[in-house]
């Protein structure tokens, strides 16, 4: 059984992330969405909240698991007996960064492969940071994040606008 891992902070999960998750789940037997615990970074949502939101939006996909991890991704991969990392790419700058990370991961464990998936063009501009910015300034995020998590974002940002 081939298990792949799609790591990220997902703060919050976007429609771009969800697009990669759904597509990646079709090319492996099991996909683990691995939510990074970064104690040096204060996110909008806690790790537990992010895990719960991703579970909510992927609940109809039986081969998707959502877990958190801290430390080296390679250690998490070994623990989960996975040899495949899934990474989504939006732009050339994403590729440059992710290529370096893939080389480092391969240096740490030559058995690990990184598979790059191109983001759907309609999400190529989208990032969790831009979602937070748009929401904080009262913009509409309906086309940016899954509908199921809009109430979570509204509550965190304490926003009253209807089309957030």
UniProtKB/Swiss-Prot annotation:
Site (Transition state stabilizer): 17
HAMAP family: PPAT_bact
Functional pathway: Cofactor biosynthesis; coenzyme A biosynthesis; CoA from (R)-pantothenate: step 4/5
Cofactor: Mg(2+)
Binding site for ATP: 9-10, 17, 88-90, 98, 123-129
Function: Reversibly transfers an adenylyl group from ATP to 4'-phosphopantetheine, yielding dephospho-CoA (dPCoA) and pyrophosphate.
Matches recorded under InterPro entries: Cyt_trans-like, PPAT, Rossmann-like_a/b/a_fold
Protein name, per record: Phosphopantetheine adenylyltransferase
UniProt GO BP: coenzyme A biosynthetic process
Keywords, comma-separated and alphabetical: ATP-binding, Coenzyme A biosynthesis, Cytoplasm, Magnesium, Nucleotide-binding, Nucleotidyltransferase, Transferase
Main enzyme class: transferase
Subcellular location: Cytoplasm
Enzyme Commission number, as recorded: 2.7.7.3
Source species: Clostridium botulinum (strain Langeland / NCTC 10281 / Type F)
GO CC, any one term: cytoplasm
Record field: catalytic activity: (R)-4'-phosphopantetheine + ATP + H(+) = 3'-dephospho-CoA + diphosphate
Major site of localization recorded for this protein: cytoplasm
CDD domains listed in its UniProt record: PPAT (cd02163)
Family: Belongs to the bacterial CoaD family.
């Amino acid at each position: 059984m081939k298990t792949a891992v799609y790591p990220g902070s997902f703060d919050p999960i976007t429609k771009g992330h969800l697009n990669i998750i759904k597509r990646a789940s079709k090319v492996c037997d099991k996909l683990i969405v691995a939510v990074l615990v970064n104690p040096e970074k204060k996110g909008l949502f806690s790790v537990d909240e992010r895990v719960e939101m991703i579970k909510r939006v992927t609940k109809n996909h039986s081969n998707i698991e959502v877990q958190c991890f801290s430390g080296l991704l390679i250690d998490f991969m070994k623990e989960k007996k996975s040899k495949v990392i899934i990474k989504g790419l939006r732009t050339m700058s994403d590729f440059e960064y992710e290529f370096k990370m893939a080389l480092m991961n391969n240096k740490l464990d030559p058995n690990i492969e990184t598979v790059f998936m191109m983001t759907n063009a309609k999400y190529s501009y989208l990032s969790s940071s831009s979602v937070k910015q748009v929401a904080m300034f009262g913009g509409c995020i309906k086309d940016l994040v899954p509908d199921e998590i809009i109430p979570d974002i509204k509550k965190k940002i304490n926003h009253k606008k209807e089309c957030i």
